[in-house]
């Protein structure tokens, strides 16, 4: 049972603790995935979000649903947003995202089957395959998205 005492920041962990009853509360974290998909022709699947003014390329991304593994989320988001299947899903890196407790988990994957894109126009304004030479220079390295696209462009993803 929880008491009504005001909680304080724990000195050892990122949590709140009640000094009276010892109850601990960890922050809620919302995991999301982002995936860099490549094909056998050395192309990267890039996207642009629908209804956004930023004219930068992005990658397929989305939040993990309850009861879903990260890898299942990668498969589902790709099928929902662009209608493709992938294999060889591999962890790349992660990044705390925003101030609301999101955690972006990056993956790489290989196209498995057709490269035909079936765009979900409610989510995306554009999705296409680009070679490294077709990707514009990236001077913003603040996000996992930009890092992954840049690393593909320079052959080190």
Spans of model-derived segments:
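Short functional micro-motifs and their immediate structural scaffolds
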Residues: 5-8, 26
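Active-site-adjacent beta-strand/loop module that shapes the phosphate/pyrophosphate-binding cleft
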Residues: 95-118
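N-terminal strand-loop-strand
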Residues: 12-59, 63, 85-86, 109-111
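Nudix hydrolase/Nudix homology domain
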Residues: 1, 53-57, 121-157
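Cys/His-coordinated zinc-binding microdomains
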Residues: 1-4, 22
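The catalytic Nudix box helix
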Residues: 58-93, 107
């Amino acid at each position: 049972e929880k008491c009504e005492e005001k909680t304080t920041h724990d000195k050892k962990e990122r949590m709140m603790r009640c000094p009276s009853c010892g109850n601990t509360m960890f922050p809620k974290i919302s995991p999301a995935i982002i995936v860099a998909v490549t094909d056998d022709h050395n192309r990267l699947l890039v996207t642009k979000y629908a209804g956004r003014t930023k004219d930068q390329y992005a990658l397929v991304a989305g939040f993990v649903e309850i009861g879903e593994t990260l890898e299942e989320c990668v498969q589902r988001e790709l099928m929902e947003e662009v209608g493709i299947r992938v294999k060889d899903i591999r962890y790349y890196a992660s990044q705390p995202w925003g101030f609301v407790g999101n955690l972006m988990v990056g993956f790489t994957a290989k196209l498995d089957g057709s490269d035909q894109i079936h765009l979900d126009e409610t989510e995306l304004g554009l999705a296409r395959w680009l070679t490294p030479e077709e990707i514009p220079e990236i001077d913003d390295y603040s996000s996992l998205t930009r890092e992954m696209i840049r690393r593909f462009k320079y052959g080190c993803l």
